[in-house]
Amino acid sequence: MPKLGMQSIRRRQLIDATLEAINEVGMHDATIAQIARRAGVSTGIISHYFRDKNGLLEATMRDITSQLRDAVLNRLHALPQGSAEQRLQAIVDGNFDETQVSNAAMKAWLAFWASSMHQPMLYRLQQVSSRRLLSNLVSEFHRELPRQQAQEAGYGLAALIDGLWLRAALSGKPLDKPLAHSLTRHFITQHLPTD
């Protein structure tokens, strides 16, 4: 009989091991055997909890997107009466949370983005994440701008966030958070009306 609570512990071990494997050898070269070895479990455990490698990769992407959602929501909940500018910066800062800009997370996101073009489930998850970001940004800009301008500003800020993130990921260096904050803050203030 399995120990109570073991499923969540095992799932976490396997997701963490998957992130480590992707970080070290890439998604396509990360095998079930390597992941199981890193997690200290048998390959059968992966099949038991996730069916196969694709199921494990999907769960890993869901985990990363959940961490992103939580990072943004925690910052927004801390600003219930915040201005549009403050809330937009909170969304930006959530996207640059350590859970999203660590080496392992960045490599995993890049691998998932590339694979999402060929795997419908990963594509769907990527689209949900992208739409959520754009929706949050447009909603906050719309507090101060007409709908069309809010959509354009939201799209521009989403592109800036993705661009800063992608440049950092491809450089192999940590994201320069002060620079990212400064550039995104400048974009936000340039698009919001002044009092």
UniProtKB/Swiss-Prot annotation:
InterPro entries with a match to the protein in the record: BetI_C (IPR039538), DNA-bd_HTH_TetR-type_CS (IPR023772), Homeodomain-like_sf (IPR009057), HTH-type_TetR-like_transc_reg (IPR050109), HTH_TetR (IPR001647), Tet_transcr_reg_TetR-rel_C_sf (IPR036271), Tscrpt_rep_BetI (IPR017757)
Pathway named in the protein's UniProt entry: Amine and polyamine biosynthesis; betaine biosynthesis via choline pathway [regulation]
Superkingdom classification of source: Bacteria
GO terms, molecular function: DNA-binding transcription factor activity; transcription cis-regulatory region binding
Keywords (A to Z) from UniProt: DNA-binding, Repressor, Transcription, Transcription regulation
Domain HTH tetR-type per the UniProt entry, residue ranges: 8-68
Signal peptide: none
The name this protein goes by in its record: HTH-type transcriptional regulator BetI
Species the sequence originates in: Escherichia coli O17:K52:H18 (strain UMN026 / ExPEC)
